[in-house]
Amino acid sequence: MYYKRIRELREDNDILQKDVAKVLNTTQQHYSRIENGSTEITADRIVTLAKFYNVTSDYILGLIDSKER
């Protein structure tokens, strides 16, 4: 699921939830719910995260396993 990928990307890059929340223009609490899978993420936020982490949206969605763009 996508939420595992976005948590993995954040942790691998040593980034705090509050910092990713700022990128997404949301609160840390809301981002935490996205990362835990209890709240869905919108397509535009997936694209924003893909650009932020320099990966494809397909990688975040789990459609491919390569992080390469």
Question: For each predicted feature, which ranges?
Answer:
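Short amphipathic alpha-helical segment with a characteristic S/N-K-E followed by hydrophobic residues
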Residues: 40-41, 60
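Conserved hydrophobic/aromatic packing and binding residues within compact polymer-binding modules
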Residues: 6, 20-21, 31-34, 60
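Short, charged recognition helix plus adjacent turn
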Residues: 12, 59-69
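Short basic helix-loop element that most often maps to the first helix and adjoining turn
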Residues: 4-23, 48
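DNA major-groove recognition helix of helix-turn-helix/homeodomain DNA-binding modules
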Residues: 25, 45-59
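Recognition helix of helix-turn-helix/homeodomain-like DNA-binding domains
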Residues: 25-40
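DNA major-groove recognition helix of helix-turn-helix
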Residues: 35, 53, 64
